[in-house]
Amino acid sequence: MNNLSYFTKTKLVWVILSLSLLSACATKTPDNLIPVQVNHVSQAQAWEMQGKLAVRTADDKFSTNLYWLHTADINELKLTTMLGTTLLSLTTEEGVAKLEVDGKVYQHDDAQELLTEITGWSIPVNALPLWITGQAAQDDKIINQDLQLRPTVLLSEKDSPPWRVEFNSWQKQSGAEIPRLLELTREQLRLKIQISQWQALSATTLATNNQKK
């Protein structure tokens, strides 16, 4: 990645804090995807979620609204205000990650590295689609489980230092059990994600065929 202008963490925090009294906005679901019910999150062909993201570091803390669209081909993450202002947009498609922030666009072949380089945050965007849905990656070590065998604490051992993920509460949405609140910590960085809405999605053609069976 060449000639990337460094966007400081302090500047981005200032932008978000200036809008922190505003709450979530609705984001339109792609026309080729429709809501479906599933028995388990792993059955979801795609999904979208809305919630809150709180970030605390040694020097700063803030919270904002989080939108995430996850499909087999696309990941789209947005930090937004209720008025529709996009503070940060990170999209990965066909192996290319694109970050839009502060009126500038940056590209890289790795979304996590791009976000870290431009914002200064080491947020695990590559692993979050699994953690948001209460699942562990192959490299994750499950430390504790509840009586329903859902993970309550796991460590991402492929990262050094590792991420510690705590699933503090659960809920049922789109027919599946998903986390309501999860907390991620790594050294002095702490992230809290509160999921207020999670919707399983399916391609319209596939959903129509299933209904006919």
UniProtKB/Swiss-Prot annotation:
Pfam families, per the entry: LolB (PF03550)
Keyword Glycosyltransferase: no
Lipidation (S-diacylglycerol cysteine): 25
Cleaved signal peptide residues: 1-24
Lipidation residue positions, type N-palmitoyl cysteine: 25
Entries under Gene3D superfamilies matching the protein: Lipoprotein localisation LolA/LolB/LppX
A biological process from GO: protein transport
Database matches in InterPro entries: LolA/LolB/LppX, OM_lipoprot_LolB
UniProt KW keywords: Cell outer membrane, Chaperone, Lipoprotein, Membrane, Palmitate, Protein transport, Signal, Transport
Keyword RNA-binding on entry: no
Function per UniProt: Plays a critical role in the incorporation of lipoproteins in the outer membrane after they are released by the LolA protein.
HAMAP family assigned: LolB
Subunit structure: Monomer.
Similarity-based family: Belongs to the LolB family.
Name of protein: Outer-membrane lipoprotein LolB
Source species of the chain: Shewanella woodyi (strain ATCC 51908 / MS32)
Record gene name: lolB
